[in-house]
Amino acid sequence: MTIAITGATGHLGGEIIEELLRLGTSSNSIVPVIRNKAKAATFARRGMSPRIASYEDHGALRNAFDGAREMVLISSPVLNNAIRVQQLHNAVTAAHSVGVKHLIYIGLAAPEKQAFGLEEVELATEYLIRALGVPFTFIRNGVYFDELRSELEIAAKTGVLPSATGNQPLNWALRRDMACAVAAVLHQKGHEWKTYELTAAQAFTYDDLATALSQTTGRRVTHHQTDPASAVRALTDSGMPSEHASTIVEDFQTPIAHRKFTDHNDALTDFTGRPTDPATSIRTLFR
């Protein structure tokens, strides 16, 4: 069994590879697909067979995927939808043309809620895979709990967790757990033609985060609910770079306030056997 994995130098791709190796997958059956040739040696030293291709180069993608029975396609990080849709079209049609037997496509959870404005491309890619008849598993990842790290670090120091979330629920879970779920899909049988939404088993609020952080650190942390401009100012006043603070509030906290991340289910915990509550996730994130 040969497995091609795109985005292998990224956080998710790398964690999928590590979990596959932990599960006993032979390193010589893993084909990391990477853009930067300079990073190939890192994989080759571990017995893997890296191949060089970018999402823009259909021919290189064909060569990279050739001989792979299974493939993990991690959605493009590019935010321009016109570019993303072409990149993903290239990857899917390349996989189809070389006879990939099982395509695991990793996109965004709850695409119908349009949390980021990227979801139409995710859905178009799923429809393309269906139209070509490639056996698939669609993994729709929720937002990574890891995105909260900088906010939680500041709150642990200051005792205040500022947000413009309206204390609405969110369903974020650890990237590590999502990588484990993808590896399980590859390692087990019976996941073809299925769609999995990977989120926390129960949604939680910033109040819950503050409580969990208090329990974890031993320092009382309170959630301070405020407006977006004040949330950005509070984060920057605590030492966060202003651009990063604006991204957190505009791209993440505002969608939370608009209830874009409320759906939840047990699929992730069924794959990993691990809890997804805030306290557990915080301990894992900072250990």
Predicted regions and their residues:
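Glycine/proline-rich active-site loop of Rossmann-fold NAD(P)-dependent oxidoreductases
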Residues: 148-154, 185-195, 261-262
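Terminal hydrophobic/aromatic helix or amphipathic segment near a protein terminus
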Residues: 212-258
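N-terminal Rossmann NAD(P)H-binding glycine-rich loop of SDR-like oxidoreductase domains
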Residues: 2-25
